[in-house]
Amino acid sequence: MWRSSNQRGVSRRRDKSMRKYTRHGNADRRQRAIASMASVRKKKPRSKNTYTGNISSLPPRPNHRNIHLRNPLSPRFYHGRVHTQTHRHAQPTHVVVAGGYVDGAYRGET
């Protein structure tokens, strides 16, 4: 049943983990461990979000759009934060000059 331990793959690792049960007369413990491992392996994979009960009794899922509306640090609402200290001391991205409005820095004689 058990492959020789010099073969590559999962069986070698399994043999190594079972070694502690074979040394001091723990054959029954080894059998129990093998049985529990087999039951874990036989388990059918189920998706984690299946719910068989009544859906209406579940609490409503949070709407992810509401999170953005409540988050003042969101980049969507960055334009609304004008009167904060960080904005007051921030580096200006546009400069108003005598000739008009210039993006970036002064451009010659504008």
Swiss-Prot record:
Residues 48-57 have a biased composition (Polar residues). It comes from the Viruses. Residues 10-23 have a biased composition (Basic residues). Residues 1-72 are annotated as: Disordered. This is Uncharacterized protein DR8. It comes from Human herpesvirus 6A (strain Uganda-1102) (HHV-6 variant A). The gene is DR8L.
